Amino acid sequence: MYFRFGKGLQIQLRHSSKAVRSQLRWNSTTKLIKPIASTQHPFLVKPVTPHESYVSCTIFNEKGDVTAVSHKFPKWEFLQKYGLYPRDLRKIDSSTIDVIPSFVIKPKCILVNVLHIKAMIQKDKVFVFDTTNPDAAIKLGVLMYDLESKLSQRNINYQGKSVSYQENYEHRALESILINVMTCLETEYKYHHSVCGMILNDLENQIDRDKLRDLLIKSKTLTAFAQKSVLLRDLLDELLESDEDLAGMYLSEKKHPDADDHSDLEMLLETYYKQCDEYVQQSESLIQDIKSTEEIVNIILDANRNSLLLFELKVTVYTLGFTVATLVPAFYGMNLKNFIEDSNWGFASVVGLSVAAAAVVTITNMRALRSVTKLTLLNNHTGANNKKHLANAKLALDKEIPTFWDRWLTSARVLWSGREVLYKDGSKRDMIWKWLVDDDKK
């Protein structure tokens, strides 16, 4: 039974197709890449050796069957056959994995360069270019399996009825690529979240040097992942904003660049745009948690270092007081007459004088140390009540604000001597000049 359906049903069909793909299992009779058969990795693609004169790719036909595995094309012949330019080879070069993703819209094809996937989509064929990276080759194997099941899909069961799948061939291939990319991003984010979350939880219990080093290393890889996700999200956003690119991505049925009927493709791209944006927000939130933890750790380390310095200063102050206390008895310990040998109060007076001198020195230094440790937002000097330190912000402000009696005396002086008396003080003239200069700068 074949009939057309609306936008809401298209979304349900897209989710149903994902469920069908997730229920598929590998079968030994399934036709796929021959050199990669294995019990553990049934669809593992092997990396290839790059060649300067050839491009290597796996080809899918319009039915989703693999027609060629690692087929080599001479580069110049490949460019002429499919109407490409030499600069387009940079997008499909298998030697490197580009950080910046791109979709190049051509009249007869779409060049896809997203993370580990380099592909060319036509209206009835898909070319997946081989890679030299072993890790990327494993991910490409999963893409091959998904492409085969997605491109060969014709009908789907909906409420007990067989419904024809009306999505274009190139859009199904594009969706398979985006699904593979989002799956890789999700897997990578879960890895970063588990590792970084474990380190952050350990740092809450104990600050360790090795854990801080591991956190620094993991934060760098997490930042690279966030940058990669942001670039992909921006790419999808640019596609959604450009009607010309959306119209050019219809290869089976050509549409005019000014046409506005791109609802099915817009829904497809918007779905994966939101998913990619979610990974961006989660990764940025995790990066912010790491930065907050680093700041808290730095504050704790600074506080501990200050406590050690303060303890050392206190020990020094007490040592100085003890030294002063032993200095006076040392003088009386010399073999010289000091005229108090026969006094009944000599010993008590020397001991009392030594203790008093030690107490005075210790108390004075401890007060100075206490004033140093009292830091405020307005003032952090060592003597807020001394004339030497009139830079205290609160006292200086109170000094400059005139009281009622100050204003009354100023008015009386103006009436008696004239307004010239207000500017005889050089410090006030300098202050007024500074205010004027600051106002001009503002």
Curated annotation (Swiss-Prot):
The chain crosses the membrane at residues 308-328, 344-364. One of its GO terms (biological process) is mitochondrial magnesium ion transmembrane transport. Residues 1-15 form a transit peptide. The keyword Iron does not apply. A motif (YGMN) lies at residues 332-335. GO terms for molecular function: magnesium ion transmembrane transporter activity. One of its GO terms (cellular component) is mitochondrial inner membrane. It is found in: Mitochondrion inner membrane. Keywords: Ion transport, Magnesium, Membrane, Mitochondrion, Mitochondrion inner membrane, Transit peptide, Transmembrane, Transmembrane helix, Transport. Pfam families: MRS2-like. The keyword Lipid biosynthesis does not apply. Homopentamer. Forms homooligomers. Interacts with MFM1. High-conductance magnesium-selective channel that mediates the influx of magnesium into the mitochondrial matrix. Essential for the splicing of mRNA group II introns in mitochondria by affecting mitochondrial magnesium concentrations, which are critical for group II intron splicing. It also suppresses a variety of mitochondrial intron mutations and its absence may disturb the assembly of mitochondrial membrane complexes. Belongs to the CorA metal ion transporter (MIT) (TC 1.A.35) family. This is Mitochondrial inner membrane magnesium transporter MRS2. It comes from Kluyveromyces lactis (strain ATCC 8585 / CBS 2359 / DSM 70799 / NBRC 1267 / NRRL Y-1140 / WM37) (Yeast). The lineage of its organism: Eukaryota, Fungi, Dikarya, Ascomycota, Saccharomycotina.
